[in-house]
Amino acid sequence: MQNLQEKASEWSGVETNHAFAIDDTNLFQKLGLQTFINLSTNFYNRVYVDDEEWFRSIFAKSDKDKAIQNQYEFLVQRMGGPPLYSQRRGHPALIARHRPFPVTHEAAERWLLHMQQALDNISDIDHDSKIMLMNFFRHTAYFLVAGVEQKNQSLHPCKDADGRHPCKNF
């Protein structure tokens, strides 16, 4: 059985060492707080007006300003800055926090589309940093897909991929 990092690498096409190249550079020091606020704001401005209703509905019960704050605080912390997210919300626990949402391959790709567009729209981020960030985002998106699938499977071990309950036949 593959571990979550291996699945994330396989599904995302991003090797773990490339996904975590962000740890070799303090992107918070390099880019600054305002850049992460701008990135998160730009990203969620796109998400909340997405053309696809199914994707918008994932975020419908979330306050946009809180989503922006949660994301930029997480990014600041993860990219080498102060632990803003943990101070306010506790451990990031990404899989657990995303479990209530339909974190699927399709949703991950849609999320990544908006993040790529947001990155492309922020001129304060240099090309190499954009590549590092996008590798991290792509790998992490599929890490979440794998983690949520695994958690859901452990809660419903007798459900197959189509939602049927094959164990009831015994």
Swiss-Prot record:
Induction: Down-regulated by nitric oxide (NO), particularly during nodulation mediated by Sinorhizobium meliloti inoculation. Heme b binds at residue 98. GO terms for molecular function: heme binding; metal ion binding; oxygen binding; oxygen carrier activity. Keywords: Heme, Iron, Metal-binding, Nodulation, Oxygen transport, Transport. It comes from the Eukaryota. GO terms for biological process: nodulation; response to nitric oxide. Disulfide bonds: none annotated. PANTHER family: TWO-ON-TWO HEMOGLOBIN-3. Hemoglobin-like protein that exhibits an unusual concentration-independent binding of O(2) and CO. Required for general plant development and during nodulation. May promote shoot organogenesis from root explants. Belongs to the truncated hemoglobin family. Group II subfamily. Homodimer when ferric. This is Group 2 truncated hemoglobin 3-1. It comes from Medicago truncatula.
